């Protein structure tokens, strides 16, 4: 079977270059009252950049397939998201520094609100990180083991936390214990092979125990657990692309994904401005920077149009600071679309901008979904973005005679 990444890696040179991949999570959208958030936002810097760039749109997995953030990012990093199917749990776990061994299965969890039958709020009202941490501590004190499996809880950001299951004979081919939508009955975990059936049984029992411990909490009284995974084996980004790579991201899952592919995690603050300050401070230490902005996705999922617009404008304001660093290539895109009307990830193509001195500049006037749809790059698979970035950076040899 043809491995595109392996093929490209043989053409990568040792040529030094600086590449910035700025990912606005869930960037793509569809019009509300005639405009998408990208169109409605005041983005003079992104629009000026578009005039000097090649634009296009990406398909993260396949046309019509709605990707999770894991597949969306893996694709942007040049990995085949179908070949490398990774549970979100390992990403979240690595992102908060959880040690994962051979006997471990890790999963991502949300605190939720339910009435005993129906899940009312999949995020329990998005509690503050500090409040969630206290609940995680309570669970750690009350629940330590189910059957012969040790249970360990780790706090994450806001409503998120990680569960590690440690024991013999555990599998990770487990369906999500999550109805995926509010107002629906609970969907319990199911194992798809014998080892995973054991894991699913433990997971479902754990959720019932969590509900019992939290029964007096009016908001945080339930948990949804998904993204079950063991530690996967992936080719490492620095070896594939011959670049020292650093990741600047505030949310654990994205830090975990970057760590999984071999990027170094760069500590940063909580705001977009903090992330760009970190980028400038560490500019001489890395060849490739992955910078992640989360809130475009969060507000898309919450159906908050104006808030998504404001995050886009916040990013626009820092574009001159990135350009002033004079990267050889600046890529701006998303990992998937999260349309405000849908309040969820979607299959829609994702806007893509590539800026370098070798672009066919002057053909686009603004950065939005519709300019990108008729851009010079056309519609490409997201896993080709890295190949293009390397080409624009002068890091690929000619193929063939």
UniProtKB/Swiss-Prot annotation:
Catalyzes the interconversion of 2-phosphoglycerate and 3-phosphoglycerate. GO terms for biological process: glycolytic process. It is an enzyme of class 5 (isomerase). It catalyses: (2R)-2-phosphoglycerate = (2R)-3-phosphoglycerate. Belongs to the BPG-independent phosphoglycerate mutase family. A-PGAM subfamily. The keyword GTP-binding does not apply. The gene is apgM. Keywords: Glycolysis, Isomerase. One of its GO terms (molecular function) is phosphoglycerate mutase activity. PANTHER family: COFACTOR-INDEPENDENT PHOSPHOGLYCERATE MUTASE, METALLOENZYME DOMAIN-CONTAINING PROTEIN. Transmembrane segments: none annotated. Its EC number is 5.4.2.12. Gene3D superfamilies: Alkaline Phosphatase, subunit A. Pathway: Carbohydrate degradation; glycolysis; pyruvate from D-glyceraldehyde 3-phosphate: step 3/5. This is Probable 2,3-bisphosphoglycerate-independent phosphoglycerate mutase.
